[in-house]
């Protein structure tokens, strides 16, 4: 999701999501999420990933790695018959074991020829709860993970969300579909460019 006359969102360091591109110069140690949307034959694809500028702290690297792994762990369990609570549980349990926190204020979403539609895809939850997955469903999985507490606030621009404690935040996002027996990732990159860091 983008804003105003911008074509993407850029969420830097403690910005959780919906960061507005600016003329701020990136410096060594920055971590930035770039979130883009494509429209192909009237259908939407939504994806984001983390990039780092030069050397980053060990904590930032660990946060970025854990965020990516939590998304992929959730994706790998997708198939008809499981429930969205299973997806959230997979992310939450992995992240909290790493000592990080899962943002509750934002979630993934159904997506097709409408950008945001049901169901909401929470990145926390209990097993065997929520909507049951069926073939043909398409949605995003996009965990937002904080190095500190889960609390966020929206800035005065009414758009940019940041961590309340100013801790680092990271996010990855894929658009996925449920097939007859498994899943498909629609926003996957070429073979050599799947896993971070993309610096």
Task: Kindly give the residue locations of the regions a language model identified.
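Active-site neighborhoods and metal-handling regions in enzymes and metal-associated proteins
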Residues: 1-199
């Amino acid at each position: 999701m983008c804003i105003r006359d911008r074509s993407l969102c850029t969420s830097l360091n403690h910005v959780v999501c919906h960061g507005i591109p600016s003329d701020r110069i990136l410096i060594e140690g920055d971590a930035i999420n770039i979130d883009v949307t494509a429209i192909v034959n009237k259908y939407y694809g939504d994806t984001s990933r983390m990039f780092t500028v030069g050397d980053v702290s060990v904590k930032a690297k660990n946060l970025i790695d854990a965020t990516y792994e939590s998304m992929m762990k959730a994706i790998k369990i997708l198939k008809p018959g499981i429930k969205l609570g299973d997806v959230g549980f997979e992310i939450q349990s992995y992240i909290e074991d790493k000592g990080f926190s899962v943002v509750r204020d934002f979630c993934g979403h159904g997506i097709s020829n409408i950008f945001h539609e049901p169901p909401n895809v929470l990145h926390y939850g209990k097993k065997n709860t929520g909507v049951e997955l069926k073939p043909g469903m398409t949605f995003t999985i996009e965990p937002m993970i904080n190095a500190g507490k889960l609390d966020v606030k929206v800035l005065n621009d009414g758009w940019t969300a940041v961590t309340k404690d100013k801790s680092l935040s990271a996010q990855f996002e894929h658009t996925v579909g449920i097939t007859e027996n498994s899943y498909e990732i629609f926003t996957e990159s070429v073979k050599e460019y799947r896993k971070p860091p993309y610096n």
